């Protein structure tokens, strides 16, 4: 029994030392996966030239998967990532706002499901770094490349046909986060703030068959709250 206890203690010590060596290495690699919630900052919303002031938003839980490289300099680090992200969001509004003859219970909706590759680069600092435990904060810019052929846009109960929205192919944001690590496992909490309007416009066809831009306007910035769990290789 004493031999087994001693062996277990040695293995635990070796595991901790290995984990610490990984954390103290000049370069680390890792993966993480998590969930996010999109919160749009709506800049302008109108239908048939009528400003929409009453609406409800619905942010569905989205998911992402990330691979990263971290360059360490004592308590400081710089991290680059490549992430595949799927974000879901919809907005619902009473139809009577632009159509007085509609039923009071009628609702119209715009839904988006945007797929994309995200490439952030940020600076981090370890607030606490002791043994196998640590805590850090980080911030930096992020670029998102929209994969339009995998994305989906839906328009329900709106007074136009053939509605098509164009999302900017590249969108930029700032990210702030807090990370907690236990040995090689870590947890990240982050807030992403969109820097600009992600919509390039919505084209639609009216009852006379005329296609035009501006019948529907849905200008917004994209903000994101996210949580992830990762493993440092």
Language-model-detected regions and their locations in the chain:
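Juxtamembrane helix-break-helix junctions at the cytosolic face
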Residues: 126-130
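Outer-envelope beta-barrel architecture signal
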Residues: 23-29, 74-78, 115-117, 131-137, ...
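Extracellular/periplasm-exposed beta-strand and loop segments of Gram-negative cell-envelope proteins
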Residues: 38-60, 87-116, 144-175, 196-226
